[in-house]
């Protein structure tokens, strides 16, 4: 009889532990679920960072420089452009650069030769040393990507101060525009004028035209807020998918936040500085110390003010 009572107590004791274990298991699941929900919210916030609204008055956003190097179908450097974006001041500085600029790394090689022997990273080093600046990002841009991006924006209206005429040896890539004739240039026409010897000033004329083209295209993009906002991803992919770049998708998303905010200001933020110096012949250009100082001063003037704060969302 006593043995039966003890057995009965053991059974009751075992049964009483089951609900405790069940409650513990449910609590554990709920805790894990809460952790998962918090993680999901954090990931979602980071993934949608590009849709955030930036409060520039309380946020430190440093300006950034990107070097775009246009290469032809034979992977030869055609020209390049330094683009500095200052979100805080809503300014974009464009510095067009000839591929025949002599690099300060050795005082002999041109940027085209530097790219041919060392690729885009060595070119970035040469550009930084030659102009006395620091570029944060680099990207190679194919002829097709350049034309496509220019066409998405819609080209730009151009009236040359001299007749531009050139008969191409291949593919009917001719250039023919009358003096003072206002025409809307397509991406292909812009590219051809950038690379062919159509200017009386020689290759300096090509560099100046490149500055005019990029400045006009970017300002046109800022005049078309909805079109540009909806096309940013497309243009990024055209450059990134087929080019060499250190601009990651996350870097691009962060930049897109600032660019969208600048677009909403409805301004034309872009201006250019044309490199000054000396052409010793048609294939060697040396940047003057005076221009390097001017560029340094402009870089200093377009630095962001150091402030504290975070990107805020509404």
PLM segments and residue spans:
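Amphipathic, coiled-coil-like alpha-helical scaffolding segments used for oligomerization/assembly
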Residues: 117-179
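Flexible, polar/acidic helix-loop-strand segments at domain edges
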Residues: 151-232
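Extracytoplasmic/secreted envelope proteins and their assembly/folding machinery
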Residues: 79, 120-128, 143-147, 151, ...
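Flexible, solvent-exposed short loops/turns enriched in glycine
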Residues: 91-118, 162-168, 172-174
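N-terminal post-signal-peptidase region of extra-cytosolic proteins
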Residues: 51-54, 63-71, 78-80, 109-128, ...
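C-terminal solvent-exposed extensions
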Residues: 65-76, 86, 97-108, 233-314
């Amino acid at each position: 009889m006593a043995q039966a009572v003890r057995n009965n107590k053991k059974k009751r004791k075992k049964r009483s532990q089951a609900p405790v274990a069940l409650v513990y298991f449910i609590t554990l699941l709920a805790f894990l679920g809460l952790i998962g929900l918090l993680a999901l919210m954090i990931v979602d916030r980071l993934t949608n960072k590009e849709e955030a609204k930036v409060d520039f008055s309380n946020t430190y956003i440093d300006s950034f420089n990107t070097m775009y190097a246009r290469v032809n179908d034979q992977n030869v450097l055609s020209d390049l452009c330094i683009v500095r974006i200052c979100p805080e001041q809503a300014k974009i500085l464009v510095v067009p650069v000839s591929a025949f600029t002599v690099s300060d790394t050795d005082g002999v090689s041109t940027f085209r030769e530097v790219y041919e022997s060392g690729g885009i990273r060595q070119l970035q080093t040469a550009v930084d040393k030659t102009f006395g600046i620091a570029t944060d990002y680099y990207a190679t841009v194919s002829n097709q990507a350049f034309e496509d991006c220019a066409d998405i924006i819609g080209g730009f209206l151009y009236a040359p101060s001299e007749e531009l005429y050139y008969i191409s040896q291949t593919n009917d890539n001719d250039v023919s525009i009358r003096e003072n004739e206002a025409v809307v240039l397509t991406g292909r026409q812009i590219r051809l004028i950038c690379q062919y010897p159509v200017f009386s000033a020689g290759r300096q004329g090509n560099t100046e035209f490149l500055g005019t083209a990029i400045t006009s295209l970017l300002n046109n993009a800022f005049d078309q807020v909805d079109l540009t906002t909806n096309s940013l991803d497309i243009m990024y992919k055209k450059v990134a998918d087929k080019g060499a770049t250190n601009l990651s998708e996350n870097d691009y998303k962060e930049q897109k936040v600032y660019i969208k905010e600048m677009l909403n200001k409805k301004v034309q933020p872009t201006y250019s500085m044309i490199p000054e110096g000396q052409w010793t012949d048609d294939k060697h250009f040396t940047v003057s110390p005076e221009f390097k100082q001017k560029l340094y001063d402009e870089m200093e003037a377009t630095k962001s003010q150091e402030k504290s704060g975070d990107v805020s969302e509404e």
